[in-house]
Amino acid sequence: MDNFLSLTLTGETPRVTQGKGADFRWRWLGHGLLELTPNAPVDRALILSAGIHGNETAPVEMLDKLLSALYIGSLSLTWRVLVVFGNPQALAAGKRYCNSDMNRMFGRRWQSFAESDETRRARELELSLETFFSYEQARIRWHLDLHTAIRGSHHLRFGILPQRDRPWDTDFLAWLGAAGLEALVFHQAPGGTFTHFSTEHFGALSCTLELGKALPFGQNDLAQFSVTSQALSALLSGLETSTSSSPPLRYRVVSQITRHSDNFALYMDAQTLNFTAFTKGTLLAEEGDKRVTVTHDVEYVLFPNPAVACGLRAGLMLERLP
């Protein structure tokens, strides 16, 4: 299966749907779905996903290179792995999404959207994770969902961790730092993301990794992703990764700015970087009689977007943790 990406983009079905690599077996499970199982027994299961947004191509190309290394035997495999290229049609079209943002649909939230290829795909991915995690009771379950961002950031690479009732595993957080993440953002409430779904329903240690700028296929400089790629290679092979000399800064979400009507105004422009700081009392947004202001001494914005559809998030406000 050395043409997984090309098959995903063309929508073709491979003539052979299962086979053997150097030290593992593989199964093609459907478009953008590939399962890898080591020959030796393992108690670790890993979801590696990319392309939930079709314009975020660098992580897809990075995973494709890792798959090539596994197939030729230059990289060993010590996890059961499900590789997911999330939104094949949007990837092929070079669009963020074709109808609606799939990363708002998980946890059966797709039922609230008009039926489309993306709602059907979200349901398919939910079932795929259920099947993957029910196959064996893995002692360790991870999910790394790889993305790139539309706008610039004061932290070039950062991670977003879903709401979780239990404390986060220190080894998992340390690996995220070793993968080059400069900041970690901790959600305090449930959401419709792929990573929240895997955490809530399967107890996975999950993180959305934002790794740089969104560019079309063929325009990515993968050298910029080398730290993350090397950390993934070491993870797959069961090797230790060197810990970061400066651990990621930590933030928590303190509020969400939501657009409810056409009267909504967000007082940030296209040049506002992720993690831009605002001081207490600053007016962030208005909608009719409602004013959104900074309530903590300092808050930092993440994903500001004044052009979102009504009912969707126009930004998150963060507080830095000690």
Curated annotation (Swiss-Prot):
Gene3D superfamilies, A to Z: Zn peptidases
EC number: 3.5.1.96
UniProt KW Transcription regulation keyword: no
Gene Ontology molecular functions: hydrolase activity, acting on ester bonds; succinylglutamate desuccinylase activity; zinc ion binding
GO biological process, one term: arginine catabolic process to glutamate
Pfam families recorded: AstE_AspA_cat, AstE_AspA_hybrid
Cofactors (names): Zn(2+)
Catalytic activity reported: N-succinyl-L-glutamate + H2O = L-glutamate + succinate
Binding-site residues, Zn(2+): 53, 56, 147
Active site (record annotation): 210
Role according to the record: Transforms N(2)-succinylglutamate into succinate and glutamate.
Family: Belongs to the AspA/AstE family. Succinylglutamate desuccinylase subfamily.
Full protein name: Succinylglutamate desuccinylase
Native source organism of the sequence: Salmonella arizonae (strain ATCC BAA-731 / CDC346-86 / RSK2980)
